């Protein structure tokens, strides 16, 4: 792999003066700014003062507009060495106005950027294109490597315990092994591959690995696209230790090209699973939502319903007739209200419960649920329902009820096994059921008479 590794903790792009046009719609004015990318992957601007004249009045007008809408400016500029910057997503965080002697009024924008692009000329041609994501929050010991139809992949991150989560010092890169026949097609497919791997590794680390920068290096130019990102946080319950990412990385790459199961909305489930949770109530809801998303997105109609719709429709009509007969003894007003509500509820009678759909999907996908007590799974689902529908779990909990943390570990374990099956992973991982420990997927089937 010939792409250079990012410099850790330092600015990811050194300060450079760019001069060009600052605009909003048809209004425009000349402007200059020193721009760099800090260690977290954010574009940082230091604008030179702009004379306040009729031509630049649109800047002050936009800042003082009483509307709560964020105004996005454009800035297209060039540095002395030929580097180019452009954005249509610049917004103000402040606007300074000063009036020094003999200089008139000056405007000094303080700006941030939702998305911007830097383009640099390379000192030497780059014959084999490469696409690189800069990652926040990814820790690893050494480099992860894989080869595939699109080229060579490499993923890396720091391994120091005190490493800052928000630093964009991890990276994921793919480089073509030979010149692709269609550069644009290679770029698009490679971006999809990297995004797939990033999501799977987010699942592995139980943290949404953010990507503030994507760099495309090809021919004589490096194109660096930068996005504004929220602050990165480490996962509380990682599925893998950062020293043991090799097998899940291999599964992430392999499942892009040859998925063992065609899974709908896999990425939504992973985002819910890896979403930051500060309380056990939130962790339980997130894990259950990830599982529910997988189930409801992937069950067949025959698994979601108890009876075929046409067959149940006959039963529904009979039930409606019985309900009308019973309600005939009520006053007209009460009977009408009750009839409308009961009619809506009748459709629910034919829908299978979440846990039953879980059983059916697990059977079809062959997800091993060995060691998962059905009673514990039911209790965890009920705990989630309490949190969602009334906002708390413990108020009337009995001494015999499981602690909320136990429910979290059960639901997360089931979600982990579904996701492992979806990507074809086999190997060691971290399980929290019964306490933090190493486990193996798929779990070994115990022989008759074996107790542990």
Kindly give the residue locations of the regions a language model identified.
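Short, charged N-terminal helix-start/capping segments
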Residues: 4-16, 24-28, 107-111, 199-218, ...
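Internal, Lys/Arg-enriched amphipathic helical interaction segments that engage polyanionic partners
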Residues: 183-253
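Short N-terminal signal/transit or membrane-insertion segments
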Residues: 79-97, 219-229, 311-326
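Long, contiguous, compositionally biased segments that the model treats as domain-scale units
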Residues: 1-200
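Sequence-level detector for tyrosine residue identity
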Residues: 52, 58, 63, 75, ...
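Amphipathic, oligomerization/interface secondary-structure segments
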Residues: 233-452
